[in-house]
């Protein structure tokens, strides 16, 4: 298989027939956050909200958000594809359809969705389609998955605002997928808070250098 054929295969979403079968049972993962010891799974404190972000390799993306004041907990996983309960190795084949994502659970009284979206847009390149830098494939695509219509509307308005900012610098168009949140399949234990466990590990986050013009709530 040529490099071009391999590239095309990794950047095409698999059909239901092509996707790997996966498994009925979730793969084992951590119960608590390595950094703050909070539980990685629901129930969350009353009034807290959640959002899923995909912005390339999930190691660096998760570290970006767990450091934000008002973020209660983060976790990494796979979402947006076909294969149930996939492994990391399976997602790397491109035959699950899943993106690497970060679950961000936050207190909206402390940090707003707009503030989280500003970080999302500014800290990666949302114009690259099925890749992020040297990381190539559907698993590295840019995504925002929201848990209610109001948050989806906020995300879509932010995409429009950032699209205009990018266009003003001769960049774009944005390829970020914004959808209602699908099922999240938690990644393996060793991926959770990876850069806290491995401080010198790989982080592929690279922004465009264009500031996001979302007006933030005062």
From Swiss-Prot:
One of its GO terms (cellular component) is cytoplasm. Signal peptide: none annotated. Gene3D superfamilies: Peptide methionine sulphoxide reductase MsrA. InterPro entries: Met_Sox_Rdtase_MsrA_dom, Met_Sox_Rdtase_MsrA_sf, MsrA_MetSO_reductase. One of its GO terms (molecular function) is L-methionine-(S)-S-oxide reductase activity. PANTHER family: MITOCHONDRIAL PEPTIDE METHIONINE SULFOXIDE REDUCTASE. Keywords: Oxidoreductase. Belongs to the MsrA Met sulfoxide reductase family. Has an important function as a repair enzyme for proteins that have been inactivated by oxidation. Catalyzes the reversible oxidation-reduction of methionine sulfoxide in proteins to methionine. NCBIfam families: msrA. The keyword Oxidoreductase applies. The keyword Oxidoreductase applies. It comes from Brucella anthropi. The active site is at 57. It catalyses: L-methionyl-[protein] + [thioredoxin]-disulfide + H2O = L-methionyl-(S)-S-oxide-[protein] + [thioredoxin]-dithiol; [thioredoxin]-disulfide + L-methionine + H2O = L-methionine (S)-S-oxide + [thioredoxin]-dithiol. This is Peptide methionine sulfoxide reductase MsrA. GO terms for biological process: cellular response to oxidative stress; protein modification process. Induction: Induced by phenol and 4-chlorophenol but not by hydrogen peroxide. Active on the S and R isomers of MetO.
């Amino acid at each position: 298989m040529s490099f071009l054929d391999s590239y095309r295969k990794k950047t095409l979403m698999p059909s239901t027939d092509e996707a790997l079968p996966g498994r009925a049972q979730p793969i084992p993962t951590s119960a608590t956050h390595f950094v703050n010891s909070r539980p990685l799974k629901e129930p969350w404190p009353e009034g807290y909200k959640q959002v899923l972000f995909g912005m390339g390799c999930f190691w660096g993306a998760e570290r970006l958000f767990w450091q934000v004041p008002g973020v209660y907990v983060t976790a990494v996983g796979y979402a947006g594809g076909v294969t149930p309960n996939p492994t990391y190795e399976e997602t790397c084949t491109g035959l699950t359809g899943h993106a690497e994502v970060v679950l961000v659970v936050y207190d909206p009284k402390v940090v707003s969705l707009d503030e989280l979206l500003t970080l999302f847009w500014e800290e990666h390149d949302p114009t690259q389609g099925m890749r992020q830098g040297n990381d190539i494939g559907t698993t590295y695509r840019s995504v925002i998955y929201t848990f209610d219509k109001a948050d989806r509307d906020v995300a879509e308005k932010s995409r429009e605002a950032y699209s205009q900012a990018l266009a003003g610098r001769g960049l774009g168009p944005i390829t970020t997928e914004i959808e209602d949140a699908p099922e999240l399949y938690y990644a393996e234990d060793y991926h959770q808070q990876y850069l806290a466990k491995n401080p010198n590990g790989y982080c592929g986050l690279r922004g465009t250098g264009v500031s996001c013009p979302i007006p933030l709530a005062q």
